[in-house]
Amino acid sequence: MAKKITGYIKLQVKAAQANPSPPIGPALGQRGLNIMEFCKAFNAQTQGVEPGLPLPVVITVFADKSFTFEVKTPPAAVLLMKAAGLPKGSGRPNTVKVGKVSEAQIEDIAKTKMPDLNTQDIESAKRSVRGTARSMGLTVEG
């Protein structure tokens, strides 16, 4: 028989840098989960990813206080800021443009994000990433 799911926890955790401090500790602690077990497993699974890159993670909590987790791809906004070499996006994206990204960079980011997007078409994924870039005040060249 399958385990009974009691809930889901969604967090953004820096790759290979999970520790029991907030936000991880309180989120897992109030559900009675083993915090160190999650931290060790997450850090081991994200070893190959660039350290410090924020990764969304969905933790499935079961009735017997066990859990599983799924690590998603980094947010498109983070990948775009990294590609443009910016610390953050524009405060007024329609009037103040803060940087530029090339069409090739957009395609690379779209390919990276494909597993988490609800499309199988690379063109749709590129449109989604372009929209994120526009909303951050980035200009797409090419």
UniProtKB/Swiss-Prot annotation:
SUPFAM superfamilies membership: Ribosomal L11/L12e N-terminal domain (SSF54747), Ribosomal protein L11, C-terminal domain (SSF46906)
Gene3D superfamilies reported for this sequence: Ribosomal protein L11, C-terminal domain (1.10.10.250), Ribosomal protein L11/L12, N-terminal domain (3.30.1550.10)
Gene Ontology biological process terms, A to Z: translation
Keyword Lipid metabolism: no
InterPro entries for this protein: Ribosomal_uL11, Ribosomal_uL11_bac-typ, Ribosomal_uL11_C, Ribosomal_uL11_C_sf, Ribosomal_uL11_CS, Ribosomal_uL11_N, Ribosomal_uL11_N_sf
Post-translational modification: One or more lysine residues are methylated.
Family: Belongs to the universal ribosomal protein uL11 family.
Function: Forms part of the ribosomal stalk which helps the ribosome interact with GTP-bound translation factors.
Record protein name field: Large ribosomal subunit protein uL11
Gene that encodes it: rplK
